[in-house]
C-alpha cells in the first residue's frame, strides 16, 4: 500500500482491488473468444455510469453508437478482420470532433454538433476502436486542472480531493480508474504529460504532426498535438500507431514510424542528461523535494540499465516563453471563433483572448520565425546526450478546487509554480513521454518526462519500456472510491 494517514490517496499492488486489465489483455481475450466487444463496451459503459457522479471524467457518453459499433466489431472479427484495435473501448478528449456530437472544449453553452469525424477519430474507428465517449477538459485546454461551470470538477482516481491535472484530465481519470484502457488527449503545454504524471500513467506527446489535427491544418499555431494516455508503454504505443498518419492538408507531416516495434527492444547504451533547471517564465517555481528524489531514483534506474546519466540542462534562453505565449494565446483566439457566440467563457479565458488578439499578427509571425533558432539552441544539448530526463511537474497534484477563485494573474502564477517544465517541447514540436516515477509520502503520483529530439518516439518508447520492466509501475492502481 502506498499512502499516508490523513489522506484518502493510495495505491494497491497486485491484491485487494480487482486487477485492471490492460489493452493488450483485452486484445488477447477478444482474439481467443473469451469475451466479445459488446461485453467489453457494456462493461466500460457501466463503469462510466457508476463513476460519473463522483469522478466526472466524461462530458459526453456515446452509449447508443458505442453499442452499435461493438456489435459491428464482433461481426468484423467473426468474418476474419484483424484490425489492430478491433472491439476495444477507447475515450477521446472533448476537443476532437465526433460526428453528430458537439465539441464544447470545456466551455458552457451551445455548440453545434460536428458534421464529420476528425481524422484521429476516423483512424481509430478504422482500426476497430469503439469510441465510448468524450472526456472532460478545462476551457480551451488552457490550464493543468479539469474543471469549469459547464461540467463541474473532474477528480483524481488516486485522491478524490485532488485534480487529475489538465487539460486532458478527463482522459487521464478515465484510464487511471479503469473505465477504459487508453484514451486520446492533446498536449499544448503539457496537457497529456501533466495529468499522466498526476495519475500514474504513460502519457505520450508525439512529434508535431504525428497524429493529424485535421480538420485543423495545425492546432494552436503548431504548439498543440494529439497524443495518448495508457497504463503501459505497450498499450500507449499500440494506440499511437493506430491514431498516427496524415491527410494532404496537414501542415506538419513527419516521416512515418511504427512505434510499437520499439517496445521490448533495447535502445542501446544511451547518454542521458538529468535536468532540474526550469525554463524562464517570469514566475518562480520550486521543485518539490520528493519529486526531485523520484527523478534522481529514475536516473539511478537508468544507470543500472546500462545508460550513462549526467547532470545537464537545455539552453532555453529568455525569449522562449514569449514565443510560446504568442503562439498559444493567438491559437485561443482562433478556437473561440470556431466555437461561436453562444458559449459563456471564463473571465480568465476572456483575458487570454484579448492578449491573443494583440499578439496574433506581427508578434506571432516573429515567434514563428524564431522556431528554427529556438530548435538549434535548445537542441544543442543533443550534440552531447541522447535524451533529457526531467521532472514532469514541480509539485504534486493540487486540490480540485485550488484554482476556482483565482484571477488571471493568480492562475498563471499557480500553474507555473506547479508545472513549469513541459511547455518548451510543445514550442519545439519534439516528442516527450511521461512515465510514472513513484508516489509522494501522501500517496500522490509523481511522473518524470523523457524528452528527445525530432522524430525520436521510437527511442523514447524503448527507453520507457525498459523503465516499466524494472519498476513494475503497471501493477499499482488506485483504491476504488468512485463507485460509492
Swiss-Prot record:
The keyword Hydrolase applies. Pfam families: Amidase. Keywords: Hydrolase. One of its GO terms (molecular function) is amidase activity. Its EC number is 3.5.1.4. It catalyses: a monocarboxylic acid amide + H2O = a monocarboxylate + NH4(+). InterPro entries: Amidase (IPR000120), Amidase_CS (IPR020556), Amidase_dom (IPR023631), AS_sf (IPR036928). The active site is at 93 (charge relay system), 167 (charge relay system), 191 (acyl-ester intermediate). Belongs to the amidase family. This is Putative amidase AmiA2. It comes from Mycobacterium bovis (strain ATCC BAA-935 / AF2122/97).
